[in-house]
Design a protein with these regions (language model features):
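Compact, glycine-rich, soluble single-domain proteins
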Residues: 1-84
Length: 84
């Protein structure tokens, strides 16, 4: 929140115990973000959210926030490997 930019290669990962409807909002976020909703490492939804007003929901056991444009070409059904 309140960051003016998101560094290249940055990802914020939110793991959850089980798959459920997860809501992401952009209140107080100043830059657009690409968001991936994953279930068992499979993408269920991809969306670019706008600063301040964006909101979206999706089924996920993991949610990944990325710099805008980082998820270009990623589609529902793709597999994502999280490497820490």
């Amino acid at each position: 929140m309140f960051q003016g930019e998101v560094p290249d290669g940055y990802a914020l990962v939110f793991p959850f115990e089980e798959a459920a409807n997860r809501t992401i909002h952009m209140l107080f976020v100043r830059v657009p973000l690409d968001v991936l909703w994953l279930v068992d490492d499979e993408v269920t939804k991809v969306e670019t959210l706008r600063p301040w007003t964006g909101i979206a929901h999706g089924l996920a056991d993991t949610v990944v926030e990325l710099p805008s444009g980082a998820a270009d070409g990623v589609e529902a059904g793709d597999t994502v490997e999280i490497v820490a």
